[in-house]
Amino acid sequence: MFTYIDPSIRKRLEEQGKLFQIDGDGARVAAAHAVTRGPAISLLGPIPLPLKLGELELQVDWYACVRRTELGKLEEIADELRAQQGQALFATLASSMAVNSVLIVGDPERWQDPLVRVHSSCLTGDVFGSQRCECGPQLASALQKIREDEQGGMVIYMSGHEGRGIGLWAKAATYLLQDGGEDTYQANRSLGLPDDSRDFSDAGSLLKFFVRGQPFRLLTNNPKKVHDLEKMGITGITRVKHVTGVTDANRRYLSAKQGWGHKLSREDLDAQ
């Protein structure tokens, strides 16, 4: 049973230290205490997770992460459903909650300058292997680089960032507009949506908790991502170029990202 469905399981996991909370500053807080800075995040883990992605095999510790406000609301509704014998609605209830993930490689207690990837979810690229974007290769490459790095590091997988935050349904519509000649940002605007509506505040809190103020290297071509994290008070970020997965199918898409400010050179866009 999920922790928001069965309170006895929730209590047991809390006693084992496998279910806990952090505040917006990344400080661990007791479940009964009020959070003073930013939204609280509930974490489940660490959960040993052996991964195999193509030829890449590695062992990570997985943490499932969700905003405490979302979890709290679902727990209240779940209590009512349980009292009314409404178990059939639990699946619908669970589907409305965005759960992020943290994948840890190595021992965070020994990190001094870990390698980090904050990765936005992309069903078409990460799962289906679509070449309209470079998301799938970026995720696989990040995990391989982190595994091979002497420091180790982490991937923060942001589940609510599909289509730069507009969601899968709207993303599908932008693909049709792109096929009609618009670039990825023009397509968003045609739908009345922002170029990029992603919120990295939860990623910032998770970085504060796991990295603990140490300098770290961030795998990204997007200076805005660095800027957004720095606005949250995170310092010591070194941006590391992360170009991979360039194909004829996504070259125009990557060119639009270059025009929007991503650090991509002509040589990067010409690569195969």
Name each model-derived stretch:
Residues 1-272:
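Catalytic domains of riboflavin
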